């Protein structure tokens, strides 16, 4: 291995904290959007975003050139242009809100006690910064709550592109999106199925505080506690919900849903299926994030099967790809 290649390994495995912080600045100032209408000199970018010293902006932009986020002109040094990557993180792409959420400062603070969490075998994240749990951050920090909501919208927008043709809701009368936040997922799906009615079901705090609730004539926003009861329906959606909880809590939730399910009802779970033959970086990252924020976890297919068997369900269909999903029904 060449010397330069060896040092690239150091960057890849030891310097991620710098990457996260640098990218946070890029997203905070929407720099990817600034390049969408054409190349710009770093001094112009610096002026737009309000840096006091242009040279610091140059070093920020240059840092991301070998990472293929930006391109620097070889003819006009200091002039930067967009790449396919940067477009994805602009308003013309689908990843801006999701990326901005994941690189925020709160997540960075939680990561500082990851070694303790791993060594002790118990979540140390929220308590390390004086929180009783992760949800307290959403309740008390308006900025983070908005970034959380935006992040969920961003993820939903991204997967909606790939869901078409994967799942079919046409045979159902009522579909409930459990933990649906703003209702963007179920609301968007209703546009595809004119005979389906939708219910967006989430906590009172979420339902009555979201400024971006999806409006649709066949969609109701209902507040409640899904660990107590859920609305009756013949189909339920759960997007990235079960990963937030332990197996025991997931069993509890599934059994509560079971009580309200109509005959032949289905539950559609949009969540990661970890595959040891093709682990993806983002999937394993999310597993660690769940561990550090909620004591949750991502699951392999065998873990999903075990969870469903414990809860009185069976898998009717699943796909491990993009996106991952499982369709289950009562045994």
From Swiss-Prot:
Residues holding S-adenosyl-L-methionine: 179, 202, 224-226, 239
A molecular-function term among this protein's GO annotations: S-adenosylmethionine-dependent methyltransferase activity
One BP annotation, GO: biosynthetic process
PROSITE patterns: SAM_OMT_II
Keyword Methyltransferase recorded: yes
Pfam families the UniProt entry points to: Methyltransf_2
Keywords: Methyltransferase, S-adenosyl-L-methionine, Transferase
InterPro entries: COMT-like, O_MeTrfase_dom, SAM-dependent_MTases_sf, WH-like_DNA-bd_sf, WH_DNA-bd_sf
Enzyme Commission number(s) from the entry: 2.1.1.-
SUPFAM superfamilies recorded: S-adenosyl-L-methionine-dependent methyltransferases, Winged helix' DNA-binding domain
Family statement: Belongs to the class I-like SAM-binding methyltransferase superfamily. Cation-independent O-methyltransferase family. COMT subfamily.
Protein name: Probable inactive O-methyltransferase 11
Organism: Dictyostelium discoideum
């Amino acid at each position: 291995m060449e010397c330069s290649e060896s040092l690239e390994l150091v960057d890849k495995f030891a310097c991620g904290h710098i990457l996260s912080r640098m990218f946070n600045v890029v997203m905070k100032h929407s720099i990817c959007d600034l390049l969408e209408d054409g190349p710009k000199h770093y001094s112009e970018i610096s002026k737009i975003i309000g840096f006091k010293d242009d040279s610091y902006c140059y070093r920020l932009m240059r840092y991301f050139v070998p990472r293929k986020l930006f391109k620097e002109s070889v003819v006009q040094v200091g002039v930067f242009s967009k790449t396919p990557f940067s477009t994805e993180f602009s308003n013309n792409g689908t990843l801006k809100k999701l990326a901005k959420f994941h690189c925020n400062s709160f997540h960075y603070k939680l990561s500082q006690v990851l070694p303790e969490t791993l060594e002790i075998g118990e979540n140390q994240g929220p308590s390390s910064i004086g929180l009783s749990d992760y949800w307290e951050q959403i309740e008390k920090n308006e900025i983070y709550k908005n970034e959380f909501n935006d992040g969920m919208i961003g993820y939903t927008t991204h997967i909606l592109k790939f869901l078409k043709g994967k799942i079919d809701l046409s045979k159902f009368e009522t579909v409930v999106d459990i933990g649906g936040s703003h209702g963007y997922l179920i609301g968007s799906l209703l546009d595809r199925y004119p005979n389906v009615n939708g219910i967006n079901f989430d906590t009172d705090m979420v339902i009555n505080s979201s400024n971006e609730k999806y409006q649709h004539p066949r969609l109701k926003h209902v507040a409640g506690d899904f660990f107590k009861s859920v609305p009756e329906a013949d189909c339920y959606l759960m997007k990235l919900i079960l990963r937030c909880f332990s197996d025991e809590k997931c069993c509890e939730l599934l059994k509560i849903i079971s009580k309200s399910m109509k005959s032949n009802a289905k539950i559609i779970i949009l969540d990661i299926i970890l595959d040891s033959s093709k682990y993806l970086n983002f999937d394993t990252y999310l597993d660690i994030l769940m561990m550090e924020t909620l004591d949750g976890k991502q699951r392999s297919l065998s873990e999903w099967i075990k969870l469903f068997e414990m809860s009185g369900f069976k898998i009717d269909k699943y796909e491990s790809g993009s996106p991952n999903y499982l369709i289950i029904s009562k045994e």
